[in-house]
Amino acid sequence: MKSLQKGFTLIELMIVVAIIGILAAFAIPAYNDYIARSQAAEGLTLADGLKIRIADHLENGSCMETANAGAGEKGNQDIGKYGLAEISGDYDESKTDAKDENGCKVTITYGQGTAGEKVSKLIKGKTLILLQLVNGSYTQGGGDIDPKFVPNAVKKVQ
């Protein structure tokens, strides 16, 4: 009488390992892209926080804090976990249409935040420039970040 065979053969185990390797080859880059996109989205959160400061500065006719700002001013920068957002540009009062750019811009530099060493290597050291519109929203104005990591809320329609 033959005894019952138990377990898997070596070939079956090798096939399973090969399948897992193929799946990992697709999953790891997709996961890295996901992490980079989520970290890049923090820049938009920082920029949204600067909208109020820009609005305050526009009352003085400037995008940025003036040199003689009061002691309560927070400055032209906001530092997050993965990036640094900074206000720049020259206010253009002649623009009145809500979709026009008002001259103010926010430059987000990834990798200069409080956890800069933990930023995805796909966006570390990259910049995203956001142009503020008259209606207060932002649109993409440049930078060297890969377009696939730019948050959808600010992507320019091509």
Curated annotation (Swiss-Prot):
Q: Which GO terms describe its biological process?
A: cell adhesion; type IV pilus-dependent motility
Q: What InterPro entries does UniProt report for this protein, alphabetically? A: N_methyl_site, Pilin, Pilin-like, T4P/T2SS_Core
> Subcellular location, in the record's words?
Fimbrium; Membrane
The cysteines joined by S-S bonds are 63-104
The species this protein belongs to is Dichelobacter nodosus (Bacteroides nodosus)
Cite the PROSITE patterns for this sequence: PROKAR_NTER_METHYL
- Self-association or partners: how does it assemble? The pili are polar flexible filaments of about 5.4 nanometers diameter and 2.5 micrometers average length; they consist of only a single polypeptide chain arranged in a helical configuration of five subunits per turn in the assembled pilus.
Q: Choose one Gene Ontology CC annotation of this protein and give it.
A: membrane
Q: What is its main location?
A: other
Look up and give the membrane topology term: Single-pass membrane protein
A UniProt-annotated Pfam family? N_methyl
Say which family it is in: Belongs to the N-Me-Phe pilin family.
PANTHER family in alphabetical order: GENERAL SECRETION PATHWAY PROTEIN G (PTHR30093), PREPILIN PEPTIDASE-DEPENDENT PROTEIN D (PTHR30093:SF34)
Per the record, residues carrying N-methylphenylalanine are: 8
Q: What is this protein called?
A: Type IV major fimbrial protein FimA
Its transmembrane ranges are 8-28
